[in-house]
Each structure stands twice: as C-alpha cells, then as structure tokens.
C-alpha cells in the first residue's frame, strides 16, 4: 500500500516536472508577452533550494516525512489553484504564485526517495521479506509512465486549444486563453494526485514509521 501511494504521487510529480517545464514558456510568450520574466523565476528557485536543504530535515525530524510532505503539497495546491479560479493579469503576481507553488514541489522532490526507502523497509517489516529490485523497478516505471503521460497530454492539449507552432505565428485569442488554462491546470492535477497518493493511500505516519524501524532494529 505505501508503494502504491508513492507511485500515484510520483505520477503527479512527473506531470509537473515534465508537463509544466514543457509548456511554461508558452504562457510568458503568448499570454504575457514577457519572456524576460522567466529568468527571474529561475533565479528565485536558487534561494528556495538553499533554504529547503537545511530546513526540510529539521521539519521531518519534528513532524515526520508524511506530515511535512502533506504541508508542502497543500501549500503548493493553494498557490496552484489561484491562477485557475481567477485570471492573473499581472505577470509579476503570476510569477510570485509560480515561485511559491514551486516550494512545495521542491520539498516533494527532496523527500520522495526517502518514502521509497520506507516502502522497502515496510515490506520487510510487514511480510518478513525484501523485494528491493522489484519495488524499485515498479517505482521507476511509474516515473516513466508519468513523464510519458505528461508529454503526450501536453501535445494533445496544445492541439486541442488550437496552438500553432512557429516563431512568427500569431496565436488566436482562443489559443492564448487555452494556453493560460493548460499551463495552470497541470500543477493542480499534480497536487490532486500527490494529495491522494500521500494523504489517502500512503499509510506510514511518523508514529508508525518509528515503530517500524524500532521493531526492525530489534530483530
């Protein structure tokens, strides 16, 4: 069960990593006509990493991996939903929301492999056997599936909204509005899958994890 939860959440994460990265530039080019702002977002991610690396382990030690992840995902969900429910005309306000939403996904990326390790140890704790190779293969397969779905979905999405590729092409108003929706709905779908995977399916909270490792150590 924990591995299934991690795999579902990872599907969502790969939608964000692959899908959002694939289409993010379109919204700044076609909707805001401010591709220069993308460099600001890239620079803003550096201090996020600098802050998260020392902070996340402390949060995990106090609250556990699942609780820390859930807080990060909920935070990312809030900032991701805002551009969907209300149209953000100001490129700087939009960029701030993107950066704030990225914080939760950064935490997810930092912790997800630790959850995979917990899944391997859970198998030994629950069933008295380890299947590291099989479980790692399943998890890696879920990442590949997520990337494939993201790439294919983005291609179909762009075609559906009437986007026409080309450096000198002027997009229709419908295509521009479609780009805005497509770019912003991907993080929302990501967060939903992560909430389901980590919040509803993954069943190793701090107390259970500590008990699991205590019993494994005693063997």
Residues covered by each model-derived region:
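Membrane-embedded alpha-helical bundles of multi-pass transporters/translocases
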Residues: 1-218
């Amino acid at each position: 069960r924990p591995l299934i939860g991690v795999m579902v959440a990872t599907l969502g994460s790969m939608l964000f990593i692959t899908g959002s990265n694939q289409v993010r530039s379109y919204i700044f080019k076609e909707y805001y006509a401010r591709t220069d702002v993308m460099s600001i977002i890239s620079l803003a991610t550096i201090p996020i990493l600098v802050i998260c690396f020392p902070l996340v382990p402390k949060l995990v030690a106090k609250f556990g991996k699942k609780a820390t992840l859930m807080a990060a995902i909920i935070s990312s969900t809030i900032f991701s939903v805002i551009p969907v429910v209300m149209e953000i005309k100001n490129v700087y306000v939009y960029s701030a929301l993107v950066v704030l939403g990225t914080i939760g996904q950064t935490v997810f990326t930092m912790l997800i492999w630790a959850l995979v390790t917990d899944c391997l140890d859970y198998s030994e704790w629950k069933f008295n056997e380890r299947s590291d190779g099989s479980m790692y293969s399943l998890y890696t397969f879920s990442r590949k599936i997520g990337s494939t779905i993201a790439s294919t979905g983005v291609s179909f999405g762009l075609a559906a909204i009437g986007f026409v590729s080309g450096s000198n092409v002027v997009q229709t108003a419908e295509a521009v509005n479609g780009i805005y929706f497509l770019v912003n709905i991907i993080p929302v779908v990501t967060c939903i899958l992560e909430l389901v995977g980590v919040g509803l399916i993954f069943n190793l909270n701090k107390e259970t994890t500590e008990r699991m490792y205590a019993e494994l150590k005693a063997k």
